[in-house]
């Protein structure tokens, strides 16, 4: 367990006991990454901001159920994913939101992809991956979650998370190489 994990677990335990300062520190540490993740899932800053607020509201409501043996960061990212999925189901039901994977917001690029194309090209290529591949790829390579943590967030096995990320990276490499050849 990393020092950051231990600190977040201690903060969460204090938050469960009613510490507002502990919540503020958890929010300060996790909100930027959770927002980037939600921006990937739900393009459009206004929607991502709303989902971020809903995620931390859900964390507040669920704080008593939090198990201190589980890492806080993947737990909160899992809450964010669930909030996104509930929002998407509601949007489909009411036809209120039209999503476009082409309008992904800015986000840091994958380290090895940086030399293969511009951020816009990489974004377009990621947008054409299957949603499962793109999500696993970004959770692992961009946000640094282990395959076990991804498995817990997505409700799949660690092997399935690894396979999705691996296939996504392979498809991304092919797409970026095709773009490079087309430019040459």
Regions found by a protein language model. Name each.
Residues 61-68, 78-99, 115, 178:
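Arg/Lys-rich amphipathic alpha helix in sigma70-family domain 2
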Residues 26-45, 62, 126, 177-178:
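Amphipathic, Lys/Arg- and hydrophobic-enriched alpha-helical face
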């Amino acid at each position: 367990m990393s020092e950051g994990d231990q600190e977040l677990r201690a903060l969460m335990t204090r938050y469960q006991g009613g510490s507002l300062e502990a919540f503020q520190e958890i929010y300060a540490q996790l909100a930027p990454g959770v927002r980037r993740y939600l921006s990937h899932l739900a393009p459009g800053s206004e929607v991502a901001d709303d989902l971020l607020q809903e995620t931390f509201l859900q964390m507040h409501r669920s704080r008593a159920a939090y198990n201190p043996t589980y890492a806080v960061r993947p737990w909160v990212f899992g809450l964010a994913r669930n909030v996104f999925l509930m929002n998407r189901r509601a949007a489909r039901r009411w036809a209120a939101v039209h999503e476009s994977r082409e309008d992904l917001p800015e986000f840091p690029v994958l380290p090895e992809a940086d030399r293969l194309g511009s951020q816009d090209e990489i974004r377009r290529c990621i947008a054409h991956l299957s949603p499962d591949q793109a999500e696993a790829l970004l959770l692992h390579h961009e946000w640094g979650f282990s395959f076990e943590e991804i498995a817990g967030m997505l409700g799949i096995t660690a092997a399935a998370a690894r396979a999705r990320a691996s296939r996504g990276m392979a498809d991304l490499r092919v797409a970026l190489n095709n773009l490079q050849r087309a430019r040459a």
